[in-house]
A protein has these predicted regions:
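An N-terminally biased module of ancient metal coordination in phosphate/nucleic-acid-related enzymes
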Residues: 1-74, 156-158, 164, 171-183, ...
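Divalent metal-binding pocket/active-site signature
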Residues: 15, 100-104, 108, 113-196
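Mid-domain alpha/beta scaffold segments of enzyme catalytic cores
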Residues: 20, 31, 38-105, 109-126, ...
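Non-transmembrane, interaction-prone segments in cytosolic or luminal domains
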Residues: 115, 121, 127-138, 214, ...
Length: 269
């Protein structure tokens, strides 16, 4: 059973519609899929019905932007199979709104630097909240950047540039708890990306169910660490493509990383 449990659509910072993603998933034999949008569960019930049209079981999903309260290190928490999304959205909404305001400040920085850009220019690229990827896509398509992930993205929005400022994320343990209390399963996403394995004892205590094994950033080196952590803490191993469409420097197609069967089967129970 082929399952891709980490996908982003236009509902957050992916470039493709959910129907387009489901079409691509069906074409490569995906049978189970989860839309794991950043800090929103919007449209999760409609997506389940849409998936049936393509012979795909769509699991309720989310990716919560969190952090280690002690170190401040970023921690992403995936949630699957929740029965209600109210508490999850209540936790995530301030983060989503803060990200949008952060993006508006980034636009102001660009204006001061001489770029021709307004909020109205970028809004058509966003579903509800503006992400920095929407900003740089507009700059690319308006001829002000030679590629989406160019100078603005790397030198202005990152690396200590004038538009490099972040937002306050939720406590990672709180994210795990709210997913669990909503009837779902909480998973530590791509720990190799942030190298945040040290938070596992706290997350396990909060109810962590799984850890992401198959992911574009997880080469053999990181998979070894993940497998050991899964054994040490009694966690299921999950996986997915983390597809963002054109909003990835290296394109990750739907189905390019699959969830191990044991976790997928457990989530379907």
């Amino acid at each position: 059973m082929k399952a891709d449990l980490h996908i982003h659509s236009v509902f957050s910072d992916g470039s493709d519609s959910r129907e387009s993603i489901l079409q691509k998933a069906a074409a490569v034999g995906i049978k189970v899929l989860a839309f794991t949008e950043h800090d929103t569960t919007e449209g999760w019930q409609e997506s389940i019905a849409l998936g049936r049209r393509y012979g795909i079981t769509v699991l309720p999903g989310v990716e919560i932007s969190a952090c280690n309260a002690e170190t401040g290190k970023k921690v992403h928490i995936l949630g699957y199979g929740f029965k209600s999304a109210d508490a999850i959205n209540a936790l995530c909404r301030p983060v989503a709104e803060a990200r949008h305001e952060n993006s508006l400040q980034k636009i102001k920085v660009l204006q001061k630097l001489g770029y021709k850009i307004t909020e109205a220019d970028v809004l058509p690229y966003a579903h509800k909240y503006i992400f920095k990827k929407h900003i740089v896509r507009y700059l690319f398509e308006s001829g002000q950047e030679d590629k989406i992930f160019g100078h603005v993205y790397h030198k202005i929005f990152h690396g200590g540039g004038p538009g490099d400022f972040g937002i306050k994320y939720v406590n990672a343990a709180s994210a795990v708890k709210v997913i669990t209390e909503s009837g779902g399963k909480a998973v530590l996403a791509h720990p190799g990306q942030q190298n945040n394995f040290e938070i596992l004892p706290e997350l396990k205590k909060a109810g962590l169910w799984g850890i992401e094994l198959k992911h574009p950033v997880h080469n053999a080196y990181w998979q070894k660490f993940v497998l050991q952590a899964a054994a040490d803490y009694g966690l299921f191993c999950t996986g997915g493509s983390d597809c963002h469409g054109i909003y990835s420097e290296k394109y990750h197609a739907v189905g390019s990383n699959l969830c191990p069967a044991a976790a997928a089967e457990e989530l379907l129970k």
